[in-house]
Amino acid sequence: MKEIKDFEKIRIKIASPDQIRSWSYGEVKKSETINYRTLRPEKDGLFCERIFGTTKEWECYCGKFKSIRYKGIICDRCNVEVTHFKVRRERMGHIELSAPVAHIWYYKYIPSRIGLLLDITASNLNSILYYEKYIVIEPGDTDLKKMQLLNEDEYSEAKERYGMSFSASMGAEAIKTLLENLDLDELSSKLRLQMIDKDDKTDKKLLRRLEIIENFKISGNKPEWMIMDVLPVIPPEIRPMVQLDGGRFATSDLNDLYRRVINRNNRLRKLLLLNAPEIIVRNEKRMLQESVDSLFDNSHKRKVVKGTSNRPLKSLSDALKGKQGRFRQNLLGKRVDYSGRSVIVVGPELKLHQCGIPAKMALELFKPFVIRKLIESEAVFNIKRAKSLIEQEVDEVWQILDNVIKEHPVLLNRAPTLHRLGIQAFEPVLVEGKAIKLHPLVCHAYNADFDGDQMAVHVPLTPAAQAESWALMLSTNNLLNPANGHPIVFPSQDIVLGLYYLTMERKNVMGEGRKFSNFNHVLLAINNKSLDYNAQIYVKVGEEYIKTTAGRVVFSEALPGKISFVNKTLSDYELQTLISEVYVIYGSSIVIEMLDIIKELGFRYATKFGCTISMSDIIVPQEKKVYVEKANREIAKIQNDYTKGVITGEERYNNVVSVWSKTNEELTNKMMEILKKDRDGFNVIYMMADSGARGSRNQIRQLAGMRGLMAKTSGDIIELPIISNFKEGLSVIEFFISTNGARKGLADTALKTADAGYLTRRLVDIAQDVVVRIEDCGTINGIKVEALKNGEEIIEPLREKAVGSYSIERIKSPITGEIILDVNEEITEDKIKLLETVGIDKLVIRSVLTCEAEHGVCQKCYGRDFSNNKPVSIGEAVGIIAAQSIGQPGTQLTMRTFHIGGVAQAGSEDDKIALKNAFILNGLEGFNVQVDGGLLFTRKGVLRIINVIYEESIKKIKKLKVSDSQKVIKGMSLFIDKSGVEVLSSHIGYIKIKDNKLMIVSEEQEISLKVGTRLEINVGDYVEAGRVIGTFDPFAEPIIAEVKGKIKFKDIILGTTLKEEINLETGNIEKRITDQVFESLDPRILIINDRGVEIASYVLPGDAYLQVEDGQDIDIGDIIAKLSKGSEKTQDITGGLPRVNDLFETRIPKNLTEMAKVSGVVQFKAIQKGKRLINVIDEYGVEHKHYIPAGKHLLVRDGDVVRAGDMLCDGRINPHDVLEILGGISLQEFLLAEIQDVYRKQGVSINDKHIGVIIKQMMKKVKIVSVGDTNFVYNQKVDKHAFYEQNKRVIEQGGEPAVASPILIGITKASLNIDSFISAASFQETTKVLTDASIAGSIDDLRGLKENVVIGHLIPTGTGMNLYKRVKVRENSNSEV
């Protein structure tokens, strides 16, 4: 068989019978395998040497020819060719079937492919193939119809009636005849006409039939090939039979399955020769069909064939499928030689690029290299002698080993390898003992600790592999996290504590207040023990003295020369910032030097500090008792309100939980305050938490404050908190309550790891072929980015979103008019600073989402590679990096956050509105009424405010340099004050002169208000920072009367829509609307005037508590009913990992909201079939219908004006609706924001572009809406680029192009719909993918990584790109000297 190495594509097709025969070296006629006496293969059996080749090298079966010189000769006695025994892995045989048999892949898998072609249901097809029913093939001139099914009796009757004038048959023969008679072209045009007739109502079956027919036409496959006359037999070495110790044989299951087929086939052949009765033959044919089905796919049958130990036999399909299948077990993941594993221990003496390898292990790993050197040095002359020297471990061997490992990198890997930093290269250093030594600073990238973790070592063998390890994988070249560009090599724990101790300041210690003329004098004083590290001193730097501490001088002096003096207490955050800054300014070489110095110093001073903890370090605040008593008083008041019936049970519960949350928070603040003051800040517990070395505020709270609220198994919070802390000790009940949380924590962690791993696998699968392939795709589209704000606070600055991208537009300075950023220019840190100083906070940048590269993405749209802060290089596998960046932090996400009235996780919910900054109220939106001198919002409202960033009294100003409403930037002159000094602006904003004040104000911002908010200010008011401007009820949403009149109940019927419950605790009667839905009843409260005319109407959602009686007088602003927030608790809101899963899989949320399809005016209609019809009337007067389940809480009222995409009722947003209503760009923004929100809440930073890469892959396909003159089928889903290509061709030929709409596909589905069938088959549903690919004659262009790994090519990224494969080195012919 010839070696095929260099091919570019792979095609899969259905094999025709002739092709199967051409592969074969002979027919297998007997089911025998090996002769039990001679242990040689039986002739014509499943292991026959004549067919499959000899079992002994260069020897025929009978032994007449023995030697390589007879190569290729066929023995005249035994007919066996003299060859190498390896041909038994390649040579195939065949079985000539006595009756045609259908292939299980094409008839059994849903949808049945044969069934679709012939338009027969799967069950009918089954009954034909299994000889239960006849099918009419040619009706002739009878009343029968073609393809009509007949049972035995009907067939006999028809035979008697019509004789031979019609033909009907059963079994695979019948199906084969029908398939041979199919005219695909005629069928195709007939179906296309049917689709046009049906138009929008096209059923999926028509679409599927058309797709299959088109696939057969294009691929050149013939439909009748799905029925087999001849069966291939795979080479015997692939289904081996081996002798075990006891003389028994172990055989592959396939041999048993083949034997069943051969036995039944031979029996059928004999029966046919004997002209046996039809019923017996039919039964044998059915059994043959059944045995071939088992051979191809045993697991898919209802009755599985079982082997000796009652275990299902593994068929051909099973060998491909699943984790243990050929794809995932042997092709995508292989075992490696030259590797070892051992426990890791810390190696504080190592340099960053080194690791310690046990001498014994190194000797074994580098054995071939050592042997070579031994032979070269003429210490020995053959390999055998060299091996024995190595076993004796003589001195020369160790010397040679030392030389061999110098500059020969090894790869260290820790499982699980969640991102690319899970494998890094180091230079090995020989160490004693049996443990691998690891540098402490790379632990974070590996997520390793030294509590028994193990790591694997791999040796790169070839010079090319070694060069790649040095250049790309060395730990010193992997300092940054590819997910976000932040340093990933940074100190933690001991090192941080040591440096924090070194750089802290302490009062009243030796040498305080002394002055030193230079750093050396300080070091001298320390060495002479006349100066304490934490003493505050003054040191001359340049011309002036700076206030610092001795420890900071020690730290700064140790750093590499270029780095400026670091004068602050170093916590972990400060150290990371320092590393980041040094990297940006001085580059990686200085950082590497600095990191080793930091490690050294940290360990040394942690040892010097020698911190210990005692019980007396845990200080419980004395005020604890006061706080707890205060909380108990508040709870008594809440209980009292509840007893009186003022609040509902749910509100009481929410309020109690809120009180305890607040109390816990106050107590924690007090406790931290006391700890901070204790021993001048040198309380060890406080130091550990404050430095970020170990422990958190939350953990200290449990030690010295109170443990706080616990959750039940159901996720509800138990309203009785654990008031004790660990120092005081828990009571029995408190201990019992806490056990549940502890157990849940452990169970969750186990589940979470598997889930996060599966998420990563799906992400890698969808993005694995996204590689940077070209420099510039030339797009003119981009996306808008701006700083992400929550009210006033900036959650993510513009810098995080834009740095490293390319601008799509030219940006000029609003003041000078000079160009700051040009089109297609990289946005660097400096450019961002420039933009910030001139007040530009919105940009349009190039993004992977808008990239138009046909395959993968282009350099300009991707921007910067975060692993080295340089523009991304062509060939970078950005899809895999994106998948790893999203999947790796998955284990840190919570499994599910229980949402309980907004507390437990989020602390307490406030009931007041107060803003941090002073502001001016610019305007109000939303329906509100005047009540008691304030404004009451009866529906949701919006405050429009402008923040006051800077203010100065006009009285202090001599001359103004600016005018009202003028824009100012940093450094601009504002005024000259009374003393003649010019004052410059240090802010960006707009000038506002009001109430004798000069102010700089921000752009207008919106703050949303809840229903029932009472506002105490008016438009135009200036409000000081921190003033309470409004109040609301955080635990209930009221329905408020907007007019004065009399209450009238409509459809509120006791026992039907209204439920009266007597509260057993309080004895009060609570009236609640039921959440049952009635066809015609629509419970609402009307307000009527004196004449009995309805002037207002309020729809009551399910679970609303009535606050009024029928016929009662009501005033503006009175509460009619309220909805308790507690009802949200039951609709458990998914957070964390499950939420990310739902978003990537584009699942439709359970509690769906309805979005307005257009902008317009809301009009309420009646309830039909349990759903309320709401029309939105657009500007042209067209009504757009929206159906909302009755009982849902509506967010709009009759007559409201809504915008397209506004939510009409409570619930979660469906991403597919966003795409349909607001378009692709809005959908991308929505998904990006939602996914980032989950990660950001957990403190995980992932750059937008990684999520963008995945979203781009989810939106690769479009759905055909109108076919035009193209070959597409209505409703078909096709690749965007294929769609544009075909349209381009049709337009060039003067035809009408097709029209398509964008669609969103979840990641699992998108991975299966990928162009490469190898990649899709190795992901999931292997057999289904291969079935469809073979019908379509799919060609795999081997563009992605996975396909190439499977077939054993270099992956087409980085150095393996085709770009570099054809590089040849030519000798320069200029030989003149």
UniProtKB/Swiss-Prot annotation:
GO terms for biological process: DNA-templated transcription. Pfam families: RNA_pol_Rpb1_1 (PF04997), RNA_pol_Rpb1_2 (PF00623), RNA_pol_Rpb1_3 (PF04983), RNA_pol_Rpb1_4 (PF05000), RNA_pol_Rpb1_5 (PF04998). Binds 1 Mg(2+) ion per subunit. Zn(2+) 2 binds at C777, C851, C858, C861. SMART domains: RPOLA_N (SM00663). Its EC number is 2.7.7.6. It is an enzyme of class 2 (transferase). One of its GO terms (cellular component) is DNA-directed RNA polymerase complex. Its cofactor is Mg(2+); Zn(2+). Zn(2+) 1 binds at C60, C62, C75, C78. GO terms for molecular function: DNA binding; DNA-directed RNA polymerase activity; magnesium ion binding; zinc ion binding. Keywords: DNA-directed RNA polymerase, Magnesium, Metal-binding, Nucleotidyltransferase, Transcription, Transferase, Zinc. It catalyses: RNA(n) + a ribonucleoside 5'-triphosphate = RNA(n+1) + diphosphate. The RNAP catalytic core consists of 2 alpha, 1 beta, 1 beta' and 1 omega subunit. When a sigma factor is associated with the core the holoenzyme is formed, which can initiate transcription. Belongs to the RNA polymerase beta' chain family. This is DNA-directed RNA polymerase subunit beta'. It comes from Borrelia recurrentis (strain A1).
